[in-house]
Amino acid sequence: LVIIVRHAERASEPATDPALTPAGERRAEALATALADARIGTILTTTYRRTRDTARPLATRLGIEPQAVAVRSGGPDTHIQDVVAAVRRASGNVLVVGHSNTVTAIVAALGGPAWPPLCDTSFGQAFAVQPNGAQTAVLRLRYGEPDAAPGAGCL
């Protein structure tokens, strides 16, 4: 089972690598509570602070060291391929903490449906993907406080 989420709410400064806002910290705790019994064996993040901070409460609770999948040159497609390769090497159920432009693309790369990217205001969606040969089951779930209504062309 692979659970894919976007990082929690982030501050606007510093622009290059912001921390989570207080709302984001609460959402990260809500994620840890929601997944406490999900038998997560591997946590994958990017090298960006907001993804690591989102994963931290669950990682601490489970005693797991998150693995950062670097965002290399080559754009999002290269990163998505790297994440999928890391998922396939992982042990146990996997949590992937990504970004608005990668979450649904990772779902699709694992065999799920092609959805538009997440909206800038979408932080509380989780996608549970169960690859199973030719059949891939996907559940779209919500956790934490409700998000703002999505805009056009995004989830």
Regions found by a protein language model. Give the residues of each.
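Active-site-proximal alpha-helix that buttresses catalytic centers in soluble enzyme cores
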Residues: L1-S91, V103-F127, P131-L155
